Every structure is written in C-alpha cells, then in structure tokens.
Amino acid sequence: FTSSATESNNLAIKGIIMSNMKNNIGKNVITSSQEHSSINSLCGWLEKHGFKVSKISSTNEGLINLANLKELINDDTILISIIYVNNETGVIQPLEKVGELVREIRQDRLKRNIQTPIYFHIDATQAFGKISIDIAKLNCDLLTACSHKIYGPKGAALLYIKKGVQLEPLIHGGGHEFGIRSSTVNVPAIFGFFKAFELCQGLMKRDYKKYTSFSNKIMKILPQNIKGVYFNVPKNIRVPNIINIRFDYIEGESLVYMLDTHRIGVSTGSACASAFLTASDTLISMGLK
C-alpha cells in the first residue's frame, strides 16, 4: 500500500529502473502520449537522467496505436507503462493485447538470449471500480489503483506487484511493506480503502448502467439544443462516467463559470491540469487542434 496513485506510479517505474541499473541494461521506457501527469513528469525526469522515453501515437478516437507500439520496442526496452482508462476522455485502452505482446517479446528474448527483461505497468486509477479488471488476462507485472476514485478515504493507494518482480524502494527505513515501502502504514485509510472496494464490487454494475443512461441523455440532448457541439470520443470505447465535449464559439473558462452558476460541475481538463490554461496533450495526440 502507498499514499497515492502518484506514489504508486513512481514506485513502479523508478523501482524497476533502479533495480536494473547495476546491470547497465534497459535504458528505454515506452508510454503513451496521453498519460497522467504523474507519469509524464516522471518521464521528463528519466530523460534528464539519460533514459530514452518513447511515446506511442494515438488514433483519432484516442486508442493507442498498437502497430506503432510494436515499432517502438527494441532490445533495450525495459518497461511499458500505459494508462488503462484516460482521466480526460474515458477511453479504455486495449491492454490485454499489450499484455500478450509483452509475453511474446519475453519468449523471443529468451530464444535470442537477450538479457534485458521487459515489464508491463498499468495505471488503472480511473479504471478501478468502473470496469472489471482481470490481472491474469492483462498479463501485467505492476498495476496502480487508489482509494478516493472509489469514494474511499484520500491518502491510500495500492501497487500490485507480480510475484518475482523486484523493485528498488523509493523510501528507505524500517522495511515496511515487505521492504518495498518503509513508513508507518496508514491502517485507518487502508481499512477505509478495503471497505470502499467491498461496497464498490456490489454497486459497480448498477452504477455503470446509471452512468450509461446519463451519458446517453447528454449525447442526445446537447446536439438537439446547441449547434457546434462535438463528442471527442465514441461511447463504445470509453467508460460512461467520463464525457469529453468541445463547443464552437465559446471559451472554456467562460463556460465553466456559467455552468457553475447553474450548479453544474464541469472542467476544462483533468483535476491535475485544470489550473493550467494550456491545451490538452491527450486531445492534441488525437489530432484535435
């Protein structure tokens, strides 16, 4: 357990990188062009320290380009880290196919006696509690999830680590969490996380139907009443609780303030980036201007 999804993401990526540094192998990391800021900022740090970070291109609908991913992988690639559900668009990435690709690469490297291992990390923060997550089908080595996304207490998150995967800890001390994360364990927050997960399991199907019904109404009513409204992602490839919309002839912040006066909450970007009045990297990667 960790304190946040940001910490889990950092532990996953830095932990893999640092545990293999002594062998001087694995200088290439691959991620997508629409990751959370905790991944993007970390990738910038990796590049400053001599690592090559390759980013997978996106389709116009926001899905990762699997053909491009195959092209980016080389014998020095040590880690692939991809967000499961995008926090801005809600797109669900085809990560079972990525997991299968990683399995094939391992088999190929074994045959060719390539010493660099390859790991697969999934940032499932937005997927957790919204869609079914099957670790075996995903074939991932590491997976991030957190409490507050399922209405549990803030300050608790997890990092799933596949048996046999070695991580160098970020925090050194008393050897808590099997030596991976030293620090006094936040038992109340973790218990709340567990309880929220229990409740979530029983409510997930009901909530999915509720969100789908609301999403369908929004997608029907808005175009009927407003000209120049566009839904950036088809509903069949996203979670229904996230809708990404753009409008002609109105500035984003003005729309946010106007809707707020009517007690309707919207955002011009993710919670982590909405304070910065810059274009969304995720939407730019989809070809939107």
Locate each region found by the language model.
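Pyridoxal 5′-phosphate
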Residues: 1-289
